[in-house]
A protein has these predicted regions:
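Structured binding elements
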Residues: 109
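Anion (oxyanion) recognition and catalysis
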Residues: 106
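Active-site diphosphate/adenylate-binding microenvironment
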Residues: 18, 22-27, 94
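A short N-terminal helical cap/helix-turn-helix that marks the beginning
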Residues: 1-8, 27-49
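Low-complexity, small/basic-enriched stretches
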Residues: 1-21
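Conserved AMP-binding/adenylate-forming core of the ANL superfamily
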Residues: 45, 49-103
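The conserved SAM/SAH-binding core of class I Rossmann-like methyltransferase domains
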Residues: 115
């Protein structure tokens, strides 16, 4: 996937890297769609998110599950009236839902304000 966003991926030295590292950023780049959802297509059963609580609880989510959950969350946010360009303060402490909400807000085009 990295080839989609870099003009060159192999370098012979640190100097070569410094001189020739150039990013390709699509005009309407959206990390949630262009990276996370693309990974859901390429490797749907790989772990996208592994979250562990202080009590040792674990939540493991594949890229497919992550895409499905962020799609549903984005639809819910839009149902609430959140739209492209809206600023949304996200207060979820250290819960795994924070990551789902961040990506869902990206999908909506809203501006997430982590708090």
């Amino acid at each position: 996937m990295i080839e989609r966003f870099l003009t060159q991926t192999k370098f012979t030295s640190e100097d070569d890297y410094a001189k020739h590292l150039h990013f390709i950023v699509p005009e309407n780049f959206n990390f949630a769609y262009d990276v996370m959802d693309a990974w859901a297509e390429e490797k749907p059963d790989k772990v996208a998110l592994l979250w562990t609580s202080e009590r040792g609880e674990e939540v493991s989510t594949t890229f497919r599950e992550f895409k499905e959950q962020t799609d549903r969350t984005a639809a819910y946010f839009m149902q609430l009236g959140i739209k492209h360009g809206d600023k949304v303060m996200l207060i979820l402490k250290r819960h795994y839902q924070w990551w789902l909400s961040m990506m869902a807000l990206c999908k909506v085009g809203a501006i997430a304000i982590p708090a």
